[in-house]
């Protein structure tokens, strides 16, 4: 099935490309989402008229992503985690945790846009990539630190008064 892309589609093509895809992918995803249209002569002519409007829209999205990239690059996240002996983490730091921490800083990003090869399992500073647009990838510094160690032994223990026998 030949289609004209109306937007940049990851791993497929850019705005205006004529691509060949399997019929199911075209009918069930690209066409209903408005990401493509059938590649006929009439549609090619109509698309050329619409291309400037779509290109301006894509440029606006790219500019907004670049601005957000600068904001993310200036942000350093500090994520406190529970650790055991030898500073070994309980669990790991995932994209969901990083996304929630970014949301607390006022940057709302879908966790699927945060690119981690594997979950973070060590303390320290880690560079995490965030794909904001097909052309814009921001780098975020995530500092994983140990939570304040609050132990139960530090709390004063109150001894119970001995009970008096019942009469």
From Swiss-Prot:
What is any one GO biological process for this UniProt entry? translation
- Any GO molecular function: structural constituent of ribosome
Alphabetical UniProt keywords? Ribonucleoprotein, Ribosomal protein, RNA-binding, rRNA-binding
Q: Name one GO cellular component term.
A: ribosome
Q: Which PROSITE patterns match?
A: RIBOSOMAL_L9
- Family of this protein: Belongs to the bacterial ribosomal protein bL9 family.
What does the record give as the function of this protein?
Answer: Binds to the 23S rRNA.
Name it: Large ribosomal subunit protein bL9
């Amino acid at each position: 099935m030949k289609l004209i892309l109306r937007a940049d589609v990851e791993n497929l093509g850019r705005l205006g490309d004529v691509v060949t895809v399997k019929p199911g992918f075209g009918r069930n995803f690209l066409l209903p989402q408005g990401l493509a249209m059938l590649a006929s002569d009439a549609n090619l002519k109509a698309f050329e008229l619409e291309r400037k409007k779509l290109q301006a829209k894509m440029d606006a999205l790219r500019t907004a992503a670049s601005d957000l990239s600068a904001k993310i690059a200036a942000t350093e996240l500090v994520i406190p985690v529970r650790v055991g002996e030898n500073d070994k983490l309980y669990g790991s730091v995932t994209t969901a945790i990083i996304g929630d921490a970014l949301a607390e800083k006022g940057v709302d990003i879908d966790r699927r846009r945060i690119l981690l090869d594997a979950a973070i399992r060590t303390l320290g500073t880690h560079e995490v990539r965030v794909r904001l647009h097909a052309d814009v990838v921001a780098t975020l510094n995530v500092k994983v630190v140990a939570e304040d160690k609050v132990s139960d032994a530090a709390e004063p223990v109150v001894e119970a008064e001995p009970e008096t026998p019942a009469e």
